Amino acid sequence: MTSKTKRNIVVIGMGYVGIPAAALLADMPGHTVVGVQRRSSRSGWKIDWINAGKNPFEGDEPGMDELMARVVLDKKAFHVTDDYAVCQDADVILIDVQTPTDTNRIPQYVSLREVSARAGKYLRPGVLVVIESTVAPGTTQNIVQPILEKESGLQAGADFFLAFSYERVMPGKLLEYITDFPRVVGGIDEESTRRAVELYRTIVRKEITATSVLAAELAKTMENAYRDVNIAFSNEMARVCESMGVDVYEIRRLMNARPDRNMHLPGAGVGGHCLPKDSWLLKFGVDTYGKFQVPARMIALAREINDEMPLHLVDLTVQALAERGVVLDGAKVAVLGVAYLEDSDDTRNTPATAVIDALQHKGASVVAHDPYVRDLDGYELTRDLDVALQGADAAVIVTRHRLYYDLDLARLKGIMRAPVLVDGRNVFDAEAVRSAGFTYRAIGKG
């Protein structure tokens, strides 16, 4: 992981992908990196924060504090601006913006189109552009490439180079998943691929596989669709186990004793930027650019099953309260954890919002708690656990933050109005909770 080539690198989009990628690249000799970030009301604070050498992630991110201080303050190799004019001096431009889907499951490329156009205005001959945002298969060549060519007056493959290389980052392991995971790189032509591989070799320790741009796009969306389908199986089996009166985690242990089996963990729902929408990106790609239509029934059903899990958690809450003679309408419910992933501050597509919405729709008063999340737009959120739990009729665990494993059940029972605990992430041992005097319900535990 060394660089003998001097590169001016621009990374557009300072989020969970762009920031660690930019910082790692800036840590390599010969690299100078500029991040581009909008000064929006939601994310504009990151500009000054990063330029002060601070890690903007509130979750546990090993190595990030030290890396940010080193590349910003010591090496002065990384800073952030909102001015796209920095693209005119770039040798490499990475695009790391969100690519959500709308309520009709159609990709919304407003940000991708905008940044492609703005970067394209400053594009010079010889520049390498890499799309790291997850996109529907066919997007790089059918949407991004024409925009770059139109705005720059240059031709991809002849005047500038274009590739797609998807991220595999996960909050809590942002740096590790970039440096120590295999990388897939696909360019629109051989030279684009070669240059992109050369770039990533400066920061990736594992194997880098070169392929076509379309194959790389398909690999990313299929990889996440595969995981989503496996999680859906586990979630459905969890409900089967509830019906049969057994513990799904015991069944999982028995199944996974066979070396070629890997039943995933069930839970309160699937979140994050990728899994809830990448199956739809895959389907959109084949629907739009494929030679013929493919129903893609399995991935659609998996999405439906996983989307039902937050509502199932609410049903378990209703059942547990009823056992105590409490109705949900008018009850106070503490929702514990709003990040989609444990010990992170990432709330993108978090199942917690679906849980809260369903509870409130049924008349509950909800206070959410999370030790890492700053705010959750439109929802009452506190970092004070006692505020959430004081006088609560039920505590519902949505995220398995380490903090919740250490909850003092006796103290919890003392401050809650009704000792009801609903576990969406297998945080507690059922027997221990019930022995402490709680009514307990959990996903997958009959």
Annotated model-derived regions:
Residues 1-446:
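Structural/interface elements that position substrates and couple domains in central-metabolism enzymes
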